[in-house]
């Protein structure tokens, strides 16, 4: 699976291969290998901190919960230098006083907690351990090079304020090892320094214009 498919796929691999005591039934949905491209765990903080989806979600939550904040941003909006949701998070919120910023942080924390409470039972961060250690599993993520090539812009690799959110925490739960690791590990991961979130499917015009990353991922 890729992206959301990889999030659901991790859960599927964990559940479908559990034995129920009937050989015929066990064989019906049995998987023999698994591949996860750009997955993530801790779904609520993952979405809130996604460079792509996060600004829209944060703006919706905050303006929906505070009429005063909505009014203030409406007045501020003509000054925006970027897209409206990005402006709201990166330009408008930092311009607020410390008390208001603390209230904003509290609202987002409460929302994240409530959303994660609903999603927790279907979050791969909790189900991933169900994938057997001897099951052949392979996963990929885009980490960037720290300079010109950015990390995944949809699913964050890790989140400073949410240690269980993102791709890397899920990789730890899945006990994924680098391809270069020695030993008999069956769970492996590759971390690409170029490419984008959808490079498995098509070249990223910004970070993989030649298509080299897509070719490597697909082969």
Task: Enumerate the language-model features and the residues they cover.
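C-terminal subdomain of alpha/beta-hydrolase-fold enzymes, centered on the catalytic histidine
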Residues: 26-219
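Conserved hydrolase catalytic core segment
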Residues: 14-32
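Gly/Ala-rich beta-loop-alpha elbow adjacent to hydrolase catalytic centers
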Residues: 1-9
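Structured segments of extracytoplasmic/periplasmic soluble domains
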Residues: 12-19, 37, 173
